[in-house]
């Protein structure tokens, strides 16, 4: 590992944090039904705090002042609903870049020097909650990515096992969440259906108000599915009291598919969902624990394990008698916020057994396969990153000033942190990057963003990649009753 990531790990241990707008991904709707005082992560006051039952994160409450610690009840809480609510979030980004579209075909210097501009709608999501009763809640979220419709792929066993694509377009429409929650007690509740896998910081807090940049942190989404959502069963709750308060979540879901693992994104493309049914031969097990007992601070750890990713292949014959290919992912993250500063950070480390065998077998993918044949797949992958922003209005103590938050972010990631022989790691995947920018919180859930990013590739051996971006995003509830 280079000196940069080592230095950053020390830096992250002191700085890692995040906005209290998404303080706790597992409290969910339980507090909307059970009047248990909890610590407000923004002010530190004890309040009836109502997390978001759709995303599992606390809904951003833009425009609410954090200057006063005052108690509020259900009828005063703008996030509370009696039976139904409909909301969503969305992002639009324009970027101005000085590099080409592929650093792997730009010659010995990496990405060629060129100027190009892009504009996109990375995602637009619609979310709803419906209460069948005070203890049974239906939650759903549909996300539109890149403004288009995805594709359905079928494996036609009657046609020599060939892949058949039914519909094709540049973007994707996905059911990101669809689950039913049974509220039992503050310490134990159950959920079944399609839900977010809360591994890493970004998956647990993926709405645009919960990161400063115009786009999501790059390191996590280059290694892990993002947003990572699977079908299964979960238990969650809150235990302890005062400074010893913890939120937990454990789940069993459809495991990742080794067919999708590749050189550039490690296991990020291994998420199932290409087919009409997911393989559940080797489930994935995920757990998350958050310490939320101190004012404005949340420290969390998450773990994911799949006993045999090759068993979830749609064509198990790819892997023959290679044996199990277990996958482990460990993540630590922390969040801190007060009136003046917001900081967040995350470290992700992953280990894939039999990565050398998987790499050699991926050459068997047919040309019609939806999977990449770009190898080798690494044994270990790593990402670490953090960002810090300050609220100028509160620092200057000028209530009439616009709410401006300058920020800086650092990230290091490498989807080929360690590659097994005889394969060799590609240094063009080793990335260190700085992002600096400004957020303008317009209010009522709307935010304007601007940032500049510079990437150092392969420890500076290849051409840097630089870009300036502008973005606009929103998060909020449109209808409640």
Can you annotate each of these PLM segments?
Residues 118, 145-148, 225, 277-279, ...:
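Solvent-exposed loop/turn segments connecting transmembrane beta-strands
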Residues 226, 276-283, 322-326:
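Active-site glycine- and acidic-residue-rich loops that bind
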Residues 1-6, 241:
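Positively charged n-region of N-terminal signal peptides that target proteins for export
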Residues 20-105, 481:
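N-terminal periplasmic/intermembrane-space "pro-region" immediately following the signal or transit peptide
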Residues 77-97, 115-258, 281-286, 290-298, ...:
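Outer membrane beta-barrel
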